[in-house]
Curated annotation (Swiss-Prot):
Modification Phosphotyrosine occurs at: 753, 759, 1197, 1217, 1245
Effect ascribed to mutating residue 707 to Y: In APLAID; results in increased epidermal growth factor-stimulated production of intracellular IP3 and increased intracellular calcium release; is a hypermorphic mutation
Residue span, SH3 domain: 769-829
Record note on what altering residue 665 to W does: Found in patients with chronic lymphocytic leukemia; uncertain significance; results in resistance to ibrutinib therapy
A single GO cellular-component term on record: extracellular exosome
Name listed for the protein in its UniProt record: 1-phosphatidylinositol 4,5-bisphosphate phosphodiesterase gamma-2
Keywords, in A-Z order: Calcium, Disease variant, Hydrolase, Lipid degradation, Lipid metabolism, Membrane, Phosphoprotein, Repeat, SH2 domain, SH3 domain, Transducer
UniProt GO molecular function: phosphatidylinositol-4,5-bisphosphate phospholipase C activity; phospholipase C activity; phosphorylation-dependent protein binding; phosphotyrosine residue binding; protein kinase binding; protein tyrosine kinase binding; scaffold protein binding
Annotated S-S bridges: none
EC class of the enzyme, as a word: hydrolase
Amino acid sequence: MSTTVNVDSLAEYEKSQIKRALELGTVMTVFSFRKSTPERRTVQVIMETRQVAWSKTADKIEGFLDIMEIKEIRPGKNSKDFERAKAVRQKEDCCFTILYGTQFVLSTLSLAADSKEDAVNWLSGLKILHQEAMNASTPTIIESWLRKQIYSVDQTRRNSISLRELKTILPLINFKVSSAKFLKDKFVEIGAHKDELSFEQFHLFYKKLMFEQQKSILDEFKKDSSVFILGNTDRPDASAVYLHDFQRFLIHEQQEHWAQDLNKVRERMTKFIDDTMRETAEPFLFVDEFLTYLFSRENSIWDEKYDAVDMQDMNNPLSHYWISSSHNTYLTGDQLRSESSPEAYIRCLRMGCRCIELDCWDGPDGKPVIYHGWTRTTKIKFDDVVQAIKDHAFVTSSFPVILSIEEHCSVEQQRHMAKAFKEVFGDLLLTKPTEASADQLPSPSQLREKIIIKHKKLGPRGDVDVNMEDKKDEHKQQGELYMWDSIDQKWTRHYCAIADAKLSFSDDIEQTMEEEVPQDIPPTELHFGEKWFHKKVEKRTSAEKLLQEYCMETGGKDGTFLVRESETFPNDYTLSFWRSGRVQHCRIRSTMEGGTLKYYLTDNLTFSSIYALIQHYRETHLRCAEFELRLTDPVPNPNPHESKPWYYDSLSRGEAEDMLMRIPRDGAFLIRKREGSDSYAITFRARGKVKHCRINRDGRHFVLGTSAYFESLVELVSYYEKHSLYRKMRLRYPVTPELLERYNMERDINSLYDVSRMYVDPSEINPSMPQRTVKALYDYKAKRSDELSFCRGALIHNVSKEPGGWWKGDYGTRIQQYFPSNYVEDISTADFEELEKQIIEDNPLGSLCRGILDLNTYNVVKAPQGKNQKSFVFILEPKQQGDPPVEFATDRVEELFEWFQSIREITWKIDTKENNMKYWEKNQSIAIELSDLVVYCKPTSKTKDNLENPDFREIRSFVETKADSIIRQKPVDLLKYNQKGLTRVYPKGQRVDSSNYDPFRLWLCGSQMVALNFQTADKYMQMNHALFSLNGRTGYVLQPESMRTEKYDPMPPESQRKILMTLTVKVLGARHLPKLGRSIACPFVEVEICGAEYDNNKFKTTVVNDNGLSPIWAPTQEKVTFEIYDPNLAFLRFVVYEEDMFSDPNFLAHATYPIKAVKSGFRSVPLKNGYSEDIELASLLVFCEMRPVLESEEELYSSCRQLRRRQEELNNQLFLYDTHQNLRNANRDALVKEFSVNENQLQLYQEKCNKRLREKRVSNSKFYS
């Protein structure tokens, strides 16, 4: 964090004064790029929750941010928020911006104080508070988190919480309350007064809840193998862990060297003691406090020694390091339409990235711009980017930054680039070699705080080394076009691209962004969509019954209300509300004022709509002679769905399926009442298939799945119109008779939207593979006679997915026997995903593609008069009779000409290769001034496939597909080249969604700059973050010395591989998992070894239903042992998924670590979101044990591997005999016999391996005790 104030020099009393001023609050001006006029707000720090809040009035907070999420505090007017209000004069030294968040794109709070003193106080105070928040102990963070929960239901910051409020909070924090009695019993147990908990009681409730849910984990410390034996764990204070027991646990089980110092152990224990009376020379932890310690970040699996920079490792040549590298750094989203921003450069540099990319194009006023050429990504000023790099390059890391320049500028604008580099960077810019006579690259230490330019360089004769093959596909037609939808009779906007004589198009852009477009609803109709509006209620008593039932369930808050149409007076309404334990009614009258209908409760205050009247009295008290009251909770209308076009009261499942099958668009849906029950079903279309999901009633709520609660079906539909219901599908097309009629009229056009033309069903590719086949992820030994035993990699056929986590299947000679579902993965799903990947491999729109037109089958013509209210239209007319024409439109005549010409060249078979060559020839001039700035990173293309005799001053860039080809053919040659020269690898152009490729094999072959899309939250970016967490997050990680030995082979044959380590993992439990959508999480954990292909392996736990707050897998979860060949180049990865109502996994959180940085013992695994940002208090508890494999044991492990491979072959051969009757069965008996012998031998070998691990552990525990 960067400020102009050195807070470390402040005395403690000065820090306290500053914090007190921030707590009292300051009136400041808030700027936002979304608003043209700045606003005055009171900004203050809420110390109890560690949040910055801003408000217009004292009783209503408008917004807040968590201090722990602050990434930067930037002095001055250095954010785009200030740009819209340039007319407002604010002094530079009074302004500052807080950048915060847990996504790649950060949020901003831009403020202007009234004085420089106030601004300095806030800059200093926020830095102090951020340091304190980042260093806070886990118990302190828990207390702050509990305060947030109380304040979330009442902003007055009272010190208590009611039973009704607690019932509301628990589902929001991922815990399902089993019954109302459960909470009431807990209140009695804690000693609550009148259904109200004080904060201290709420804290006690939390501690009891977490302990009771997870106390079985402590059974691990009652075993003989434990280094100390724990006593009774029935209650949180039933027994204790004493000082010397805790020290023994830390030294022998956790292998913490610092624990030799008893004072440090005492200090660690004191942080977790919830009673100052026990903070003595001989402290002890109650068992619930010990359990909290196990889950805490103080007990993290991460070895904190890697947080420091190892300066001894920073003196090798640059080519010996992996260097954190970004692709198209300026982008904040996809490669086609997203925003470019200097903030993306700042974010990457502050994340430790050391190689960033600048895509430079000619801009106005002779100054370049940066954007992704020939796309709709926004343009940013080159000069702004250079200044941002200068300001932030060395904040996180002092080691060199490489600027990879993608050059598209004219010579004149290149000269401006060179000038800007020299003027802005000054001495930071590297302009000459560090050593004139060197024969290798300099080290990171030698290049400290230097900026290196990677750019084409003029040769001795002024020539440029450029390979035309690299550019041949770059100049292609792409952009936005309108397509005429003859079914909906409207133009829809799509992103389109031409490649290989095919036109690919994306989803309708308006539909992908529709939630951002506000609907234009007349003010007089605004109340129609509100849940408090009940239209006509048959009788006054019916309204009273609704209110009474709602208040009985929720606790009866005064002001609970509903609005209904008046039974007696036309245009009037009735307000019914709850006060002092009974229902009262008020008439909302109407009157004409100046020709406009107005509504009122009191004569002196009228409103233009019912909505405005209700909103007013929800914020302001309604005052009458007898009472004063503000409207609070709305009573939802129980049946608003009955008037909706998507609802069917009497429709069978078969009729619903028939209707959906006639509408070939994903997102089509209807809801129907199920026959003979008080439940409903939603029927929808997704991925070309019709699916159903039951909607149950729970009191007044509608429940989708097991824990997604909605007040009404209307609310359910509204929610899933904005959020994904299944995979990425949102509800889009209500199935109505009118929609069915339109589709029946236009059947031919359906083929355009039929994704099956683009994706092939897996069964068509491999029909011999049964649809219900799974692959074993790990060995399993049967514990009962009706269970299967199998080895890792086994294929289990004819699987029946039974409920309860146990499936049935066929393996070898065992037919329809049980096995645990978490030991396998469904290979039909994996095959389908791989198939999708293969089919979109060469598509210019990648995964965004939703349709393809083969231009060779069409003729292109213009529509001179335009069509359907569009002026610039061209039509693809099919050459084959009977196919429908496809109509396109553009906004400008120039765009129409470009698209028409591009398509006509294809349809007329014009070879454009010569034109492309001329285009690039014309654009290859290099400014001498820019060429002179290139010292070490000179790109070479003409000879880059030749990996012999590397020149350390050159760099070779490969697209991922080319790099993959080199690795398959000559991995050792690439490794040896990288020992002296540099390589940079970047994503293929088809990754328009900014997805990433697997970087591991490239790292394995020594590629230094493996450029990824930092803005994308995916597995490979998470692995990248894990790798560069090493060495103090400098962005430079020294490759293992073994990679530079003569005999090292990155892809060794199987005969040369040796297991060097076994890693045993057991997942015990989790806390505070994040919540997706409306449902309470049903989590499971996938544990994976990521590395070379021969190291890759994974394991899944079972699913825990409806508990994301405190799920456990102990004591039933077994330990899993992974065999690792190369621990220096492998990662341990934990991914937490939730299983949704369709049994699909959805990502919740992850934690990925280089195995060398993993600690042994019972360890907390702090969890991160997709962007590798910490999730408050979220963690796993695991047992982890690493053991080197001795030479004498290698033969045993080798025998296991050979037997596993043979068992896979035998199982597949047996399956062929059993499924193909025409095969001769002469050899079947011999196969069965060999299979049985091998299976027994494999189990024997595996038991020997496990026995050795157990013996070592038991002998160790006896020694320690």
